[in-house]
């Protein structure tokens, strides 16, 4: 929490407030999961698929980011299905170097931190959802 509080002063008020809220989430959660991209696909994908490294770099880099994001989303859905609360703390990417120092320099690229625990207010249903028709557009 001190790391986040100390670092938050470098940012404007909205980001600073989100960083402090993130610190509280991390401190209060019984489990905190850090998602780190090991870069295996970028390193081995060009050999595996026998494609030119230069041409394939952007493709494999994008796939690594998408895979990490999908893993985090699946983690959030699984936690919710078990009655647990979780949150994807993307704001911590603003202080990723400090987070990596705190995590002990894991091998790979920092992608996300997800605190998991029991909701403080289980009766609170979360934000009201808008009708699907307002969010989805079908193309003919």
Where are these regions (language model features)?
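Short, charged/polar surface micro-motifs in flexible loops or helix N-caps
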Residues: 1, 38-41, 120
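N-terminal amphipathic, basic helical "cap/leader" segment at the start of enzyme domains
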Residues: 1-31, 139-140
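Glycine-rich, charged/polar anion/phosphate-binding loops
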Residues: 17-19, 99, 123
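Carboxylate-rich helix-loop segments that flank metal/cofactor sites and access channels
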Residues: 20, 35, 40-45
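Solvent-exposed alpha-helices and their adjacent loops that cap or buttress functional pockets
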Residues: 25-27, 103-106, 127-130
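Structural motif
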Residues: 30-32, 86, 109-111
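Small-aliphatic-rich amphipathic alpha-helix that forms the alpha element of a beta-alpha
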Residues: 33, 39, 49, 53-100
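C-terminal helix-cap and adjacent tail motif
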Residues: 109-140
């Amino acid at each position: 929490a001190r790391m986040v509080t100390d670092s938050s002063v470098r940012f404007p008020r909205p980001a600073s407030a989100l960083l402090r809220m993130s610190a509280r989430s991390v401190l209060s959660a019984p489990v905190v999961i850090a998602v780190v991209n090991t870069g295996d696909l970028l390193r081995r994908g060009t050999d595996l698929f026998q494609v030119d490294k230069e041409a394939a770099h952007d493709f494999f880099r994008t796939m690594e980011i998408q895979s990490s994001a999908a893993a985090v989303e699946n983690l959030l859905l699984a936690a919710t299905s078990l009655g647990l609360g979780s949150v994807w703390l993307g704001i911590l990417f603003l202080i990723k170097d400090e987070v990596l120092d705190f995590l002990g320099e894991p091998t790979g690229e920092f992608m996300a931190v997800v605190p998991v625990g029991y909701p403080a207010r289980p009766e609170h249903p979360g934000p009201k959802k808008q009708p699907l028709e307002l969010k989805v557009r079908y193309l003919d």
